[in-house]
Structures are given as C-alpha cells and as structure tokens.
C-alpha cells in the first residue's frame, strides 16, 4: 500500500461556538451526516462534538487533495467511533466515488482535543 494523501486540521472551539451562537444549527446541518446529526442533538457538549467532526472532515478533504468542491460536501464524510472509541470515516455519495476512482483501500484517522482546540490528522492509503 502507498500513501495517497495526508491531511491535518486544527479547529478553535471558540470559533465554532461563535458560529453556533450566531447562526444556530445551520453549520451543524451543513457539516454533519444524518447519523452524526442525531448524536449532535443528544450530546452533552454539542459544540465540542461539532468542532471535532469539523476538524476530521477538513483533514479528510485535504488528504483527498480536493477540498470541499466539485460535488464533495462535508456531510459525505461521516465520522464514527469503533467499539474502542477510535475515530473512523465512512464515505457517502461523491466522496465514496472519488475514493473508488483513487483506489483508496484504507483511511486512518487520529483526533485529539483539548479545552481550546481540536486537531485531526488523516492518512489515505491505496
């Protein structure tokens, strides 16, 4: 396997909190998949949840080398946790098509957060 892409993103929690205070759930609806939206609505710290998901999705878009354009949308990258809590990515719609075109065989996600920041790194292999 070869590394096809690497992406990293860091998000300031206060920035996401300001957007949520200003525009309500608009950012969450645009960024989150349906499954993530359900978790967001029930989460004890929804801003923190959203910031972490946003960081991962930005890192995935960077790893693909495309950013969010040409039919790609944040909600096509779904972040979920395995039984041990490790973050993973599930791809939908155009994101899944792009992964197939690129020959992606695995996507690795690392996510860290502290009081003020969330940081994600994504490696795509094929």
From Swiss-Prot:
Keywords: Cytoplasm, Fatty acid biosynthesis, Fatty acid metabolism, Lipid biosynthesis, Lipid metabolism, Magnesium, Metal-binding, Transferase. Its EC number is 2.7.8.7. The keyword Secreted does not apply. It comes from the Bacteria. It is found in: Cytoplasm. It catalyses: apo-[ACP] + CoA = holo-[ACP] + adenosine 3',5'-bisphosphate + H(+). GO terms for molecular function: holo-[acyl-carrier-protein] synthase activity; magnesium ion binding. GO terms for biological process: fatty acid biosynthetic process. One of its GO terms (cellular component) is cytoplasm. It is an enzyme of class 2 (transferase). The keyword Methyltransferase does not apply. Its cofactor is Mg(2+). Mg(2+) binds at residues 9, 58. Gene3D superfamilies: 4'-phosphopantetheinyl transferase domain (3.90.470.20). Belongs to the P-Pant transferase superfamily. AcpS family. HAMAP family: AcpS. This is Holo-[acyl-carrier-protein] synthase.
């Amino acid at each position: 396997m070869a590394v096809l892409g690497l992406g990293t993103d860091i998000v300031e929690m206060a920035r996401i909190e300001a957007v949520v205070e200003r525009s309500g759930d608009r950012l969450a609806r645009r960024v989150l998949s349906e499954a993530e939206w359900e978790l967001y609505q029930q989460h004890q710290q929804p801003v923190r949840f959203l910031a972490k998901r946003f960081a991962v999705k930005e890192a995935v878009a960077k790893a693909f080398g495309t950013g969010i354009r040409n039919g790609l949308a944040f909600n096509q990258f779904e972040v979920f946790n395995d039984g041990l809590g490790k973050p993973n990515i599930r791809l939908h719609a155009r994101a899944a098509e792009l992964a197939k075109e690129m020959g992606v065989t695995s996507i690795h996600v690392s996510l860290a957060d502290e009081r003020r920041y969330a940081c994600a790194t994504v490696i795509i292999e094929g």
